[in-house]
Amino acid sequence: MILTVTMNPSIDISYPLDELKIDTVNRVVDVTKTAGGKGLNVTRVLSEFGDSVLATGLVGGNLGEFLVEHIDNQVKKDFFSIQGETRNCIAILHGDNQTEVLEKGPEVLEQEGQDFLEHFKKLLESVEVVAISGSLPAGLPVDYYASLVELANQAGKPVVLDCSGAALQAVLESPHKPTVIKPNNEELSQLLGREVSEDLDELKEVLQEPLFAGIEWIIVSLGANGTFAKHGDTFYKVDIPRIQVVNPVGSGDSTVAGISSGLLHKESDAELLIKANVLGMLNAQEKMTGHVNMANYQVLYDQLIVKEV
């Protein structure tokens, strides 16, 4: 079983409009509300793929109850309740444009943060792999993910970590390392304080920087150009076919689902990388975020090429 962790989930609300009128009333006919957050996208894709998944994180108030109720019934759930209210994230779809209003989210009390660590520690007993995704809510220390990674390491559970900014920096500077990280070029540039290109020789040098020491897998998305990866001392380039992109949002989360599934099933390097890329591509072909059509899985799978470089 895979444990997904979403520390700052949201209710994602979609308002489709023909036109967004400013400083007046806009009436919406069809409103969509879903359980949102990067970790819950991972959860949905794992469930659709057929893997057993347990979802956890922080929820609060009436919106927190709504969120838990609107997660697929096939998914096991064990969220931790806090005093603060789970946030809304609003997307106004007008014409070919999308305007977003994102709430900051609740402020987590120090004791709640400590109590969740105990909650997380207990959940580790019943899972084989951990996937941690997304931002930290206000109130938690910047090195909180390092604390989760430490507990998972102590329990012998591999961790796939998908975060960015100061939270990722804190983990990289910690002695407690995740099994997998999946930065993109922009995030690598931010971490190193210099521009990082997609040149394979440069990426090889970058991923051997001391900052990344001790991390077994580093998987770098190159968008339409595929993926560059480092596993131990071995480097790989994944070439992907061109596809018709409908909605790329959530493709990174779907990739995390594939990585986590590959670890769960102890797949070869090539199998893990292909699965991760295929799930990311399948998400991009769907209108709904964090959703894959498994009927197209094998067709794409057979087109991917993994090369050791």
Swiss-Prot record:
Entry's Gene Ontology cellular component terms: cytosol
The protein, known as: Tagatose-6-phosphate kinase
Similarity section: Belongs to the carbohydrate kinase PfkB family. LacC subfamily.
Intrachain disulfide bonds: none
This enzyme's EC code(s): 2.7.1.144
Catalytic activity: D-tagatofuranose 6-phosphate + ATP = D-tagatofuranose 1,6-bisphosphate + ADP + H(+)
Pathway noted in the entry: Carbohydrate metabolism; D-tagatose 6-phosphate degradation; D-glyceraldehyde 3-phosphate and glycerone phosphate from D-tagatose 6-phosphate: step 1/2
NCBIfam families xref list: 1-PFK, lacC, PRK13508.1
A biological-process GO annotation: lactose catabolic process via tagatose-6-phosphate
MF terms in GO: ATP binding; phosphofructokinase activity; tagatose-6-phosphate kinase activity
PROSITE patterns: PFKB_KINASES_1, PFKB_KINASES_2
Top-level enzyme category: transferase
KW Transport (keyword) present: no
Keywords, sorted A to Z: ATP-binding, Kinase, Lactose metabolism, Nucleotide-binding, Transferase
HAMAP family given in the database record: LacC
